[in-house]
């Protein structure tokens, strides 16, 4: 399928994990990609995997409004925005440090807000789509993820606001909510000491399998495409039945 032929698609967090898989999926479907990450080395690796020579890569800290504003100043076309960039940390809630709280909220939630805010004029012109990566942590109860869960809950709520506010103008805004996925961010995390291992079962899919980022990328591609034209303002769980 070439659902994104000649479409300009922007993917944040494209240096690894779900972001990289999404970029490769979009590339395979004909998109002209703009891929973004804060990690230049990993971003270059992703860029080297893309077949479309019109695609570009940009190192960008999405949590810095001046940098985001400058980036969008020279952008004149956009058909889809896919916000994947995010960070994760595990702590007992009473031990969360304020600097860690602020950093996670700034990248995950505020960064997503900045990207959407500056992309909106272009997306309204193209009647495009926004897909924000939220999490099953936004919808269920995940231990040790106070800041992360708060940030992802905010993304889900913010996305619904955009869907209602701009849906009449032809913009679709949806969230994908993955459960545990095999990515560099979630593999071998630093967990708090002396955790109750029974709580780990509450963040695992029914079959106990951490799926590939490719399975999230295919869902993102669907929501960003015209196949999902009548889907707006949803949290699409890709969680293996975790929250069922």
Model-based region annotation:
Residues 121, 164-168, 229:
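Alpha-helical segment proximal to the catalytic Tyr-Lys
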Residues 135:
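Residue(s) in the substrate-gating loop at a strand-loop-helix junction
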Residues 15-16:
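Conserved glycine-rich cofactor-binding loop
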Residues 92-93, 97-102, 200-201:
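Substrate-binding pocket helix/loop in short-chain dehydrogenase/reductase
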Residues 194-215:
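Catalytic Tyr-x(3-8)-Lys segment
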Residues 113, 209-238, 243:
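C-terminal substrate-recognition "lid" of short-chain dehydrogenase/reductases
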Residues 116, 151, 159:
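Active-site helix of classical SDR
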């Amino acid at each position: 399928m070439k659902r994104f032929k000649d479409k300009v698609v922007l993917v944040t967090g494209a240096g690894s994990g779900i972001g990289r898989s999404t970029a490769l999926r979009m590339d395979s479907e004909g998109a002209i990609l703009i891929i973004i990450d804060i990690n230049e080395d990993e971003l270059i690796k992703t860029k080297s995997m893309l077949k479309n020579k019109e695609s570009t890569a940009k190192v960008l800290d999405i949590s810095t409004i001046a940098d985001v504003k400058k980036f969008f100043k020279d952008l004149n076309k956009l058909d889809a925005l896919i916000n994947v960039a995010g960070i994760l940390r595990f702590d007992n809630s009473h031990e969360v440090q304020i600097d860690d709280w602020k950093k996670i909220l700034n990248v995950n939630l505020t960064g997503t807000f900045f990207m959407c805010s500056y992309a909106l004029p272009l997306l309204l012109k193209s009647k495009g789509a926004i897909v924000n990566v939220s999490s099953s942590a936004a919808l269920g109860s995940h231990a040790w993820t106070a800041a992360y869960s708060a940030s992802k809950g905010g993304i889900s709520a913010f996305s619904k606001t955009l869907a209602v506010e701009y849906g009449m103008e032809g913009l679709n805004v949806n969230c994908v909510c993955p459960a545990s996925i095999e990515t560099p961010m979630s593999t071998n995390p630093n967990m708090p000491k002396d955790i109750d291992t029974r709580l780990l079962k509450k963040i695992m899919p029914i079959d106990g399998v951490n799926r590939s980022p490719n399975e999230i990328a295919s869902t993102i591609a669907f929501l960003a495409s015209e196949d999902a034209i009548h889907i707006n303002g949803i949290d699409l769980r890709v969680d293996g039945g975790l929250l069922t």
